[in-house]
Amino acid sequence: MKKNIFKFSVLTLAVLSLTACTLVPGQNLSTSNKDVIELPDNQYDLDKMVNIYPVTPGLIDQLRAKPIMSQANPELEQQIANYEYRIGIGDVLMVTVWDHPELTTPAGQYRSASDTGNWVNADGAIFYPYIGRLKVAGKTLTQVRNEITARLDSVIESPQVDVSVAAFRSQKAYVTGEVSKSGQQPITNIPLTIMDAINAAGGLTADADWRNVVLTQNGVKTKVNLYALMQRGDLRQNKLLHPGDILFIPRNDDLKVFVMGEVGKQSTLKMDRSGMTLAEALGNAEGMNQDVADATGIFVIRATQNKQNGKIANIYQLNAKDASAMILGTEFQLEPYDIVYVTTAPLARWNRVISLLVPTISGVHDLTETSRWIQTWPN
């Protein structure tokens, strides 16, 4: 009898060891033997911290952003009309006195005007024959021409003078970030606008976030929406660039949404320049899992700004039991860091529980059969 009991115990342990691992699937992290920090808000009711809205045509209209209309920019037009370049340190000037070649530095066949012109020294002055040292930094070309004409009038009868900039080296604006050729761009006698600077930099890259461009002028940052400017014709977004301005085009890495739950492939998706709809996000995640997904429970979880009214998130629910409701998904625009979650159908949850219990039930059945066999085992 003792021999049978021993055999039965061994077989029982073997069967239990094979079935025990099926009782609790996946990894586990126990907190029972660890220090758990108690926080003042440990006890909270999550249900009271969210708002849930069914996705309806009315909600789509309510959430839809106001259309961006084409707008003129009279302020920029006035700035361009009044624009005059002011000479700076490092510029190279070309001074021409008609009928007096001895006063005009010849460029020569193999020498550019920038090599032979009058360089503006660190003190902001140039040297010119019959005049000597002449302060030019901060002045316009018209002011310098008038001053040279007046100074030469005592040695030349009715001098005809022309002054131009042979090389613009003193003042620069900077275009950085997601453009084809980032770097500095000279401020010249031709006004430089945001559009001009981006075109000169080779345009935007595929990863550019053109809705959140930042222009820094005199330490003050201004948001520029290139989408509104380029796609919608809102010319108010175009601004005149000044020396030292920085135009930064960020990457769209932060423009992402998360698709979780019963989809073909749980994913982190990056939004492109045109944005992303709920239908696009589901499509990029290989759609709903038709075997286990609950089509009535397609949720978009969106964090609220500054926990308005004590709410941490707004949740939008799309009931797509009727597939034609997915047309609403094509109109629902996602925002960065939205979470798209597709719930599991109740029957699928039950099937999963059963699938976990079947190995255990089989093990118990095997154990019962083994017990009967042992009881009939000859001594």
Curated annotation (Swiss-Prot):
Is RNA-binding a UniProt keyword of this protein? Answer: no
Give the main location. membrane
What GO cellular-component annotations does this UniProt entry give? Answer: cell outer membrane; pore complex
Q: Where is the signal peptide?
A: 1-20
The protein's topology relative to the membrane is: Multi-pass membrane protein
Instruction: Give the family this protein belongs to, as stated in its UniProt record.
Output: Belongs to the BexD/CtrA/VexA family.
Name used for this protein in its record: Putative polysaccharide export protein GfcE
Organism annotation: Escherichia coli (strain K12)
